């Protein structure tokens, strides 16, 4: 996976990108084993920082494209292939192949609701009707799971520099 760190080095950009790629990669899918090899590249875009979502978009794009390619190669509907691989509610709490823990979530329930709201079952008919009118119609599916924080713990330091002073660094 290639992570875009932007136009110049900000000190921790490479760490943010690579950590989030691994943390986000399984998303909502039950993937028992995984390995990530990633590289960071400089580009003409904004520099990467903690608030730019670095690594998350790359990971989501990667896993969703792999699933779409597998669906194309096997002839299995893309929604069905995703459905078969979602983390079941009875597996929560769930630990990913990269050690992240999901403490809640009904991924199949949310997925089915999204498909119903999009009328995924009726898409083939809409596509056929659009083609008769000379229009092309497509549909895409993607699942996304946001991880909170890059580190498993937070840190603070309390020091007493002397006298009646206390210094708290967070």
Please place each PLM-identified region on the residue numbering.
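Gly/Pro-rich active-site capping loops and adjacent beta-alpha segments
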Residues: 1-59, 122, 131-170
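Cysteine-centered functional microenvironments
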Residues: 128
């Amino acid at each position: 996976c290639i992570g875009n760190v932007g136009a110049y080095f900000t000190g921790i950009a490479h760490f943010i990108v690579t950590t989030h790629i691994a943390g986000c990669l399984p998303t909502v899918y039950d993937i028992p084993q995984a390995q990530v090899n990633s590289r960071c590249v400089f580009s003409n875009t904004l520099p990467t920082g903690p608030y730019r979502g670095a690594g998350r978009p790359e990971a989501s794009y990667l896993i969703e494209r792999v699933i779409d390619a597998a669906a194309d190669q096997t002839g299995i509907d893309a929604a069905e292939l995703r459905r078969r691989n979602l983390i079941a509610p009875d597996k929560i709490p769930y630990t990913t192949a990269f050690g992240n823990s999901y403490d809640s979530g009904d991924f199949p329930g949310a997925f089915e609701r999204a498909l119903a709201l999009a009328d995924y079952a009726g898409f083939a008919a809409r596509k056929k009707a659009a083609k008769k009118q000379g229009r092309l119609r497509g549909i895409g599916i993607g699942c996304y799971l946001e991880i909170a924080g890059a580190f498993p713990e937070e840190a603070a330091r309390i020091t007493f520099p002397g006298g009646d002073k206390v210094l708290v660094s967070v």
